[in-house]
Regions:
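N-terminal beta-strand motif that seeds the catalytic metal site of vicinal oxygen chelate
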Residues: 1-22, 32-38, 92-99, 146-174, ...
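Vicinal oxygen chelate
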Residues: 6-16, 54-77, 81-110, 130-134, ...
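Core segments of cupin and vicinal oxygen chelate
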Residues: 13-67, 113, 123-125, 166-228, ...
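A short, acidic/glycine-rich surface segment
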Residues: 41-46, 79-84, 150-151, 193-197, ...
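Short, structured interface segments
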Residues: 71-75, 127-153
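Intrinsic, low-complexity N-terminal interaction/targeting segments
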Residues: 118, 123-125, 201-212, 234-246, ...
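C-terminal functional regions that serve as terminal interaction/effector modules
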Residues: 213, 218-219, 225-236, 250, ...
Length: 351
C-alpha cells in the first residue's frame, strides 16, 4: 500500500515559555485544545540538539474549527537561544506559518482590537485570496489566509494551513514538495514585486514566490479536520540568504518544523530514500508523547528545512473519561466520523 498524507498536522514553534505561549495562541489564534502537555527528554533528535539528549516541555494545541495545530516546544535543560538576526523573506527555513480563516476582515479586526502587531492591512495575494500578516510577541510571523474548507463553525480563524519556506533553488524545491508531499499544483509563480507583502521583513528585495497546493483532496483519519494545505516557496535574488537556525538548535525560538499526518510509514520511508531525502531521525513505531502515541520521523528539504511525519497510533478523544482512539484498528484512507473528532472539543481549555 502506498503512503497517505492526511494533511498538515501541526507547525512546531520553539518558545522560551511554553505556558505563556499557549495562553497567547489560545486567546488570539484559537488554539484552545491541548492534545498533550508533556515534560520529557528529547532523546532521539540528536542531529539537531547538539548531539545529546535535551529535556523539554511540549504542548500540542489544536482547534476544532479545522486546520493543523501548534506544537509549542520549550527547552528545560538549557536556556533557549534566540536568533541573533531578524529573518527576512527568502532566508532559509520556515519564515511564516499560514493560518486559515473564513473571514479575513473579522479576524483582522479582532486581532487589532487585541492590540496584536499587524504587519500589513488586508490585501489580495497573487492567488486571489484575501490575507494579512501579523507578528506574535515572540517575533514569529503568521499569515492569516482566506479558506473555505472548515470542519466546524464558530470563531473565524482556524488552524495551520501551511508555511512560507525560504529556498535557494526554486525548481529543486518545487520538485521536492511535489514529489514527496503531494503539492502538485502551482497556484502562482511570480518574480514581480508584490505589494501584498509590504510590511513583511525583506519584502523590498527581489523575490521569486511560488505557491503550491494539492489537486487531490487529502484522505485518511484526520483529513476532514486538517483540510487543504499550501506551501509558499520564496527565493531571494539580490542578496545571500541566511539559515534561520544558523548556530542554534532545533527547538530554539522560531518555527522548528512542519509536521504531516501520514499513514504507512514504511512506504513513506522507501519513497523518501528513492527521492534522495532519507529519514534523518526515526523515532520508531512505539513512541509515546504524553497521552498520544505514534511513529515520528524527519527529513530535510533541499535547503535543510525540517519536515516531520507522524503516523498516529493513539489519540485522546475525551481525557476526563479516559477515552482514547486506537487508529491501528481503522482503515487507513477512511476519515474519522465528525462526531468523534468533535468530542476533542470537550477538552477545550479556557485561559
Amino acid at each position: 500500500m502506498a503512503y497517505i498524507i492526511s494533511g498538515i498536522q501541526q507547525a512546531g514553534v520553539g518558545v522560551e515559555n511554553v505556558e505563556a505561549a499557549f495562553k497567547w495562541y489560545n486567546e488570539h489564534l484559537g488554539m484552545d485544545i491541548p492534545v498533550f502537555d508533556e515534560a520529557a527528554e528529547a532523546a532521539l533528535m540528536l542531529p539537531y540538539t547538539g548531539g545529546k539528549p535535551q529535556s523539554r516541555r511540549a504542548i500540542l494545541a489544536i482547534t476544532t474549527k479545522g486546520g493543523g495545530g501548534f506544537e509549542i516546544w520549550q527547552y528545560t535543560s538549557r536556556t533557549p537561544v534566540k536568533p541573533t538576526f531578524k529573518a527576512e523573506a527568502g532566508d532559509l527555513g520556515i519564515f511564516i506559518v499560514k493560518v486559515k480563516t473564513d473571514n479575513v476582515q473579522a479576524t483582522f479586526d479582532y486581532l487589532k482590537s487585541k492590540q496584536v502587531k499587524l504587519l500589513t492591512n488586508v490585501s489580495t495575494a497573487p492567488s486571489g485570496k484575501k490575507h494579512f500578516y501579523l507578528e506574535d510577541p515572540y517575533g514569529n510571523i503568521f499569515e492569516i489566509v482566506e479558506f473555505d474548507d472548515f470542519f466546524s463553525t464558530g470563531r473565524a480563524q482556524g488552524g495551520v494551513a501551511g508555511a512560507v519556506v525560504g529556498v535557494t533553488n526554486m525548481d529543486r524545491a518545487i520538485a521536492f514538495y511535489q514529489q514527496i508531499l503531494g503539492f502538485d499544483k502551482v497556484v502562482f509563480r511570480t518574480n514581480e514585486m508584490q505589494s501584498d507583502m509590504h510590511g513583511v521583513p525583506g519584502a523590498n528585495h527581489a523575490l521569486e514566490r511560488v505557491l503550491l497546493t494539492h489537486s487531490k483532496k487529502r484522505v485518511g483519519p484526520f483529513s476532514e479536520l486538517l483540510g487543504r494545505g499550501e506551501i509558499e516557496l520564496i527565493a531571494v535574488r539580490d542578496r545571500s540568504p541566511r539559515k534561520i537556525y544558523e548556530g542554534r538548535f532545533w527547538g530554539d525560538p522560531g518555527f522548528i518544523h512542519l509536521c504531516f499526518d501520514i499513514r504507512n510509514m514504511a512506504a513513506l520511508k522507501t519513497a523518501c530514500e528513492a527521492a534522495g531525502h532519507p529519514f534523518t531521525v526515526d523515532g520508531g513505531a512505539g513512541f509515546e508523547m504524553g497521552e498520544a502515541a505514534g511513529h515520528f520521523t524527519y527529513i530535510e528539504d533541499p535547503d535543510g528545512t525540517l519536515i516531520e511525519f507522524v503516523e498516529t497510533k493513539k489519540v485522546p478523544l475525551l481525557k476526563k473519561l479516559g477515552w482514547y482512539l486506537d487508529l491501528r484498528k481503522r482503515p487507513a484512507e477512511k476519515p474519522l466520523p465528525k462526531w468523534m473528532l468533535r468530542t476533542m472539543g470537550l477538552n477545550r481549555k479556557k485561559v
